Amino acid sequence: MIDLKLHIDESFYKEEIRDGYTISSEMKKLWAVELDLLNEFMSVCKRNNIRFSADAGTILGAVRHKGMIPWDDDIDVMMLREDYDKLCKIASKEFTYPYFFQTEDTDKGSLRGHAQLRNSATTGILYAEKEYKYKFNQGIFIDIFPIENLSEDTKEVEQQCNRIALLRKKYLKYANWTEERYVRPHNKLKAFIKKIYYLLMQPYVRYIENPHKIYKEYEKELTRCKDTKTSKISKLALGKYENRRIWNRKDLEETIEVPFEMLTIPIPKGYKNILDTFYGSWQEFKIGTSTHGEIFFDVNNSYHKYINEKE
């Protein structure tokens, strides 16, 4: 287990049963890295007067379990666009190794659509991408989502979400022909053919369908209503139009402090309305319904071990 800045008592790492679910020692170690990331994130936000709150399952965990949902393995936070932009401006000087603030501006090719704070001494690689050995930072992370202002016109919001989803699909498609995301096939003949095609694609990808420029269009579309203080807000970075993701601004503007494992974190004052909208019957739960098992985690080794290893 790597050293963490956050002091965590050894007893935390013991296997235990919560709400009928067995939490392994390995899961506890993953939680510890994520809690350390969250603690560092909160420190930076506090120093710079940046507002944020827990998001989604992290709100639910705080309210229902006073910490992580026993079968969950990630932490999400959110902030209004103005605070998100402020964070992006100061992040590179505030977060130092092993903490890495990742956006497309700080780490080309990552293309997540939102920010992530990662621990560079660990590994958190999507299984779907593990064999590709992408060079961007793939340490264990917490997600940081911007919350956008929404038009009062529902049809306009639907159209905006469709444009966001299209741009997201487009930049990911053409990113596969950039140096950051190019994947060389193992078969020598296929590798040769793909390399030729890659070279032929370069003028097109560089000057016509440049994924980095498309990504900027995507970000611009996210912030279409940036300068208008609207009554409705949403997490648009996922590119899906869902009523459950549309919330009232008044529910998010103020926060309250609540226990979360060994930390105290802010959640929206109107958390009940947000949870009702997002989850429905959130006070009831089904064991094992929210884990993100599609990610390969290693709390002992940096992602460099895996992206540099030979086949």
Residue ranges and their predicted role:
Residues 154-160:
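A short secondary-structure junction signal
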Residues 14, 22-46, 91-152, 171-280, ...:
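Conserved catalytic core of two-metal-ion nucleotidyltransferases
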Residues 1-10, 71-82, 177-196:
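Short N-terminal signal/transit or membrane-insertion segments
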Residues 6-12, 53-58, 239-245:
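Short, functional N-terminal and low-complexity linear motifs
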Residues 87-89:
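Conserved SAM-binding loop
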Residues 42-75, 79, 84-85, 250, ...:
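Active-site nucleotide-donor binding segment shared across nucleotidyl transfer reactions
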Residues 2-21, 29:
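N-terminal regions that are enriched for targeting/export leaders
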Residues 165:
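A contiguous, mid-domain pocket- or channel-lining segment that forms the substrate-recognition surface
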